[in-house]
C-alpha cells in the first residue's frame, strides 16, 4: 500500500468518512487537513494532521478505526478525541 500523505486527504475536507463499528458505520466528517512542521530530514513523508467531527453525543475512545471514503478507499486511522463543540466531538489523527 502507498504511504498516505496530506495530498490523499486535502481534497476530502468537508466530506464524510465512514468508520466501521460493530454491525454499522459512524460518520466522521473531515473538517481540516493541515501540514505539520518537518521534524526529521530523513522522514518517509511530510507530517500532517487531520481533524474529524462526529455528531454523535457518544464519545468514542482513541483507537484505530477502519475508515472508508470513495476516493481514499479503506484505511485504518488512529484517531484521538481532542475537543467537544456544539456540533459534536472533534477527533485528531497525526501522521508523521
Where are these regions (language model features)?
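Short coil-to-beta-strand transition motifs
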Residues: 20-29, 69-75
Amino acid at each position: 500500500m502507498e504511504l498516505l500523505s496530506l495530498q490523499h486527504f486535502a481534497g476530502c475536507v468537508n466530506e464524510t468518512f465512514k468508520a466501521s463499528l460493530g454491525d454499522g458505520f459512524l460518520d466522521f466528517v473531515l473538517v481540516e487537513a493541515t501540514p505539520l512542521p518537518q521534524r526529521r530530514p530523513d522522514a518517509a513523508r511530510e507530517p500532517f494532521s487531520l481533524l474529524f467531527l462526529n455528531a454523535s453525543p457518544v464519545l468514542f475512545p482513541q483507537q484505530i478505526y477502519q475508515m472508508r471514503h470513495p476516493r481514499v478507499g479503506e484505511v485504518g486511522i488512529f484517531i484521538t478525541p481532542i475537543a467537544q463543540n456544539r456540533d459534536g466531538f472533534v477527533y485528531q489523527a497525526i501522521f508523521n
